[in-house]
Amino acid sequence: MGQDKALLEFHGKPQIEYIHDLLQKYCDKVFLSKRSDQGPFKGLACIDDAPEFSDHGPLGGILSAMKKYPKADWLVIACDLPFISDETIKTLFTLRDPQKTATAYISTQDALPEPLCAIWEAHAYGSVLKLFKEGMHCPRKILINSHTRLIDQKDP
């Protein structure tokens, strides 16, 4: 595409600002996960990928956040979901199972977990890290191979 998806404009503002504003209602603090060669993003708190997780895409960002704040549960939302709504986030929290590794929506395209529209629980860091060290670097595969609460999407 040649352009940072976080900066694409939807809803009259860059997508990253829309997501940030949406998540502020649900989170004590909102972070943007990014590679060390990206940004800075003015006015947004960022977590750079830790060196051991760099070059591992979204999973690198998830693990970096979990490592930096090990007691925090993580609402993970991709920056390229222009149709995500308040209702989407509210439903995720309402149907959340904190005993699981994560709570995630089921993709309407392939019936697999959506790891970038999910709540990843703090207690799962060790098991997620173990799978990463065993060579599993896809967040979707990690959720498939973990105890994940899967929820249906109301409006695919």
Feature map (PLM): residue ranges:
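Nucleotide and nucleotide-moiety/phosphate-recognizing core
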Residues: 1-156
